Swiss-Prot record:
Keywords: Amino-acid biosynthesis, Branched-chain amino acid biosynthesis, Leucine biosynthesis, Lyase
Identification of the protein by name: 3-isopropylmalate dehydratase small subunit
Role: Catalyzes the isomerization between 2-isopropylmalate and 3-isopropylmalate, via the formation of 2-isopropylmaleate.
Family the entry assigns: Belongs to the LeuD family. LeuD type 1 subfamily.
GO cellular component, one term: 3-isopropylmalate dehydratase complex
EC number: 4.2.1.33
Organism of this sequence: Corynebacterium diphtheriae (strain ATCC 700971 / NCTC 13129 / Biotype gravis)
GO molecular function, one term: 3-isopropylmalate dehydratase activity
Enzyme class: lyase
């Protein structure tokens, strides 16, 4: 997983609330056994059926900072929802409320799910709608979002922040303990099974 300190990209105003994981990626796309290739399924029902959906607007098509309404990522636990967002090109999702399981899955996969005040989300929406294609800078170090000179604070828990800044997924965390694991295995009695 890559280290995340600061990201700048096109902001995408997703002015919808209660976006659940089935809306993020419909169940029909969950049959793959790999962790990549899910970008076509992202918001598929909206992208294919609603010509006015935000990602169908050329100015937002290459967005990487999704500014969503409250209660983003609710519903069933789908790592695929996070994978689809990342595969499409999103590095950050901003919302006033996230489902706990989505927020956890996001942090583990390198997607920043940053919580902001709803009033700030609405101000960002207004800016992004008035200036399609506007750049948004998200600083994990400063815990700030900047768009066209306006600076907004966001919240992310310290542990997730540390993991993202260090670029540590679950495997990376385990590998940091490689010496301790080897020492433990060396002390194990020989009659116990070992992993190869």
């Amino acid at each position: 997983m890559e280290k995340f300190t600061t990201h700048t990209g096109v902001g995408v105003p997703l002015t919808r609330s209660n976006v659940d994981t089935d809306q993020i990626i419909p169940a029909v796309y969950l049959k793959r056994v790999t962790r990549t290739g899910f970008e076509d399924g992202l918001f598929n029902n909206w992208r294919t059926k609603d010509p006015n959906f935000v990602l169908n607007n050329e100015a937002y098509r290459n967005g990487s900072v999704l500014v969503a309404g409250p209660d983003f990522g609710t519903g069933s636990s789908r790592e695929h929802a996070v994978w689809a967002l990342k595969d499409y090109g999103f590095a950050v999702v901003l919302s006033s409320r996230f489902a706990d399981i989505f927020r956890g899955n996001a942090g583990k996969a390198g997607l920043l799910a940053a919580q902001m005040e709803q009033t700030d989300i609405e101000l960002l929406w207004k800016q992004l709608e008035q200036t399609p294609g506007a750049q948004v800078t998200v600083s994990l170090e400063e815990r700030t979002v900047t768009c066209e000179g306006n600076v907004y604070p966001f919240f992310v828990d310290d542990y997730t922040r540390w993991r993202l800044m260090e670029g540590l997924d679950d495997v990376g965390l385990t590998l940091r303990k490689e010496a301790e694991i080897a020492a433990f295995e060396a002390r194990r009695p020989s009659f116990k099974p070992v992993t190869q």
